[in-house]
């Protein structure tokens, strides 16, 4: 219906509306710190523009890795080498959990959002340590048996007044940032007969909440799903590995990937793996999002693909179009993964001068023990250097292929270095552009691996290694003690 007001009056009414909105916003910002009105106002402003603007001053921590590049590098200078020894305890807050806590807190204008085990979300006033609200998704406790590595959660996403959390039992929940009340909830698990879990933090890119999953040890097929941040409507889904080749593939990327698997292994029965349970980054200028994919299901390469093959897109960095979820490029860090060498560890986007040329790169330190520099415009391999003891490969050739050692794929017992815990795991990584240094914790826990010749998917055979846990590895773990010198350090 057309307006009957004269144009001049329409303009006056429109201007009045804008002024009224501005006054309401100012009043909300002037509300007492930590009040629902204050929280609603400051969190409503968190969007793509705010996250990018904050990266230049880092007054807040509005996104999982601080910024879209996930540098985790604060530009604040209030704490330095000269006064760090003066820091002391101001307050404590009880997360009410005796289980693992792996979350990165988000902080906006003094309001902290942090998760604990069982996907419980806490909103805390950092000025006082006072609880503002908490949200418990009531994950059934028996669901714990479907997770490999505790009922942890790595954090939330924040966008336009909402807090988004993935729950251990596979739901994605949108909460009102001011009250903790549920706005919408979606089940992200496409097949409830499979033991999918969610432990990673969602990311919000261009109004879409993107979440992956875990469960490769138990036999699942990995995928990412994007949901509309406002309504929860599913926008796209991208699988990391191909499904049953007897059925049509979802896209050309899956058809291409299937050629790198051997159907004799019936990988689709055991899921294939490749779950995205952690790292996602985004380059607004290139309009590309980057994801790291997980290990194979089962672990044993011979079991899932007897004739070999790279098994795309396991243990890879993959670039996707965030608008559509379409595949753009990939670089596989561990072709034919045989050791649980996931590539889901944190990745950082930065620009480096290499051979006299400025290049847009990804910095990545995955489980396999090599530190990678990859061109993020096209996936071209630049370099890979070991950052810890490594015995499965001596290095990478100029084409970006690992130079494997003969014993790495032996059928006999073999000390895997790094072991399945990885040289670097879920622990945060950061980059200081001033020093040009990347910082991340390194570990080395060698594990003895041997082929489980009697393995069958979900056999649950009494006395068979790992069978009672529901794990589908095709491997025996520490059937004999590791002898590597790194063991026990």
Predicted regions and their residues:
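Bacterial N-terminal signal peptides that target proteins for export
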Residues: 2-16
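Hydrophobic or amphipathic alpha-helical targeting/insertion segments
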Residues: 126-131, 154-188, 193-240, 376-381
């Amino acid at each position: 219906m057309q307006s009957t007001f004269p144009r001049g009056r329409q303009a006056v009414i429109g201007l009045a509306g804008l002024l009224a909105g501005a006054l309401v916003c100012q009043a909300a910002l002037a509300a007492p710190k930590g009040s629902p009105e204050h929280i609603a106002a400051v969190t409503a402003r968190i969007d793509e523009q705010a996250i990018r603007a904050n990266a230049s001053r880092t007054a807040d921590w509005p996104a999982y890795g601080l910024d879209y590049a996930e540098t985790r590098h604060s530009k604040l200078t209030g704490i330095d080498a000269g006064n760090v020894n003066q820091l002391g305890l101001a307050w404590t807050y009880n997360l009410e959990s005796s289980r693992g806590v792996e979350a990165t807190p988000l902080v906006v204008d003094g309001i902290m959002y942090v998760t604990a085990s069982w996907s419980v979300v806490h909103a805390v006033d950092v000025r006082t340590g006072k609880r503002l609200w908490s949200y418990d998704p009531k994950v059934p406790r028996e669901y714990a048996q479907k997770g490999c590595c505790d009922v942890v959660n790595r954090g939330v996403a924040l966008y336009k007044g909402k807090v988004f959390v993935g729950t251990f039992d596979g739901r994605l929940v949108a909460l009102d940032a001011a009250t903790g009340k549920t706005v919408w909830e979606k089940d992200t698990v496409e097949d409830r007969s499979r033991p999918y879990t969610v432990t990673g933090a969602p990311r919000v890119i261009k109004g879409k909440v993107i979440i992956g999953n875990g469960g490769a040890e138990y036999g699942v097929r990995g995928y990412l799903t994007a949901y509309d941040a406002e309504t929860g409507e599913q926008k796209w889904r991208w699988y990391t590995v191909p499904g049953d080749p007897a059925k049509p593939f979802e896209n050309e990327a899956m058809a291409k990937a299937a050629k790198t698997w051997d159907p004799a292994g019936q990988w689709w029965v055991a899921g294939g793996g490749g779950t995205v349970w952690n790292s996602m980054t985004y380059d607004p200028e290139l309009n590309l999002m980057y994801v790291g994919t997980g290990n194979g299901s089962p672990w044993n390469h011979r079991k899932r693909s007897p004739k070999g093959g790279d098994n795309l897109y396991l243990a890879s960095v993959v670039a996707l179009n965030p608008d559509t979820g379409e595949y753009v490029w990939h670089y596989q860090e561990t072709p034919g993964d045989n050791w649980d060498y996931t590539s889901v560890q944190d990745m950082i986007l930065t620009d480096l001068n290499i051979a006299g040329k400025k290049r847009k790169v990804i910095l990545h330190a995955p489980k396999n023990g090599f530190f990678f520099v990859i061109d993020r415009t096209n996936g071209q391999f630049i370099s890979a250097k070991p950052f810890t003891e490594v015995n499965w490969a001596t290095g990478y050739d100029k084409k970006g292929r690992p130079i494997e050692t003969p014993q790495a794929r032996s059928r006999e017992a073999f000390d895997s270095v790094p072991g399945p815990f990885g040289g670097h795991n879920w622990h945060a990584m950061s980059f200081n552009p001033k020093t040009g240094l990347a910082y991340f914790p390194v570990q080395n826990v060698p594990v003895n691996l041997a082929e489980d010749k009697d393995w069958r998917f979900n056999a649950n055979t009494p006395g068979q290694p790992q069978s009672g846990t529901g794990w589908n590895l095709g491997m025996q773990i520490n059937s004999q003690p590791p002898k590597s010198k790194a063991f026990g350090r």
